[in-house]
Regions:
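Ribonuclease/tRNase effector modules and their secretory precursors
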Residues: 1-90
Length: 90
């Protein structure tokens, strides 16, 4: 399941359903948001078509449903070179 924001960001950033699914199935969890509302969420990173992609997804365990919240390509301004660690800003 995709939130409207996720679909909009995928369209504007040319990120395909296949890339998002690849990251969800094969990506690495780099941040965990256990207290996110209404469902716990995670930030995953994965590669697709030569690009690094971040996917934020929540899990509604009662419906066994994954909800994609947003997806984007991490930028060097916000992420370290490995694209897994947020930069600290003064």
């Amino acid at each position: 399941m995709y939130r409207i924001h996720a679909r909009q960001s995928m369209f504007s950033r040319s990120i395909s359903d296949e890339c998002v699914e690849h990251v969800l199935q094969n990506g690495e969890v780099i941040e965990d948001y256990p207290h996110a509302f209404p469902f716990p969420a995670k930030l995953l990173i994965g590669g697709c078509n030569g690009r690094s992609i971040h996917v934020v997804a929540a899990e509604n365990s009662s419906k066994q449903q994954v909800i994609v919240i947003t997806t984007y390509e991490p930028t060097i301004e916000k992420w370290e070179a490995d694209k897994k660690i947020r930069r600290k800003h003064p």
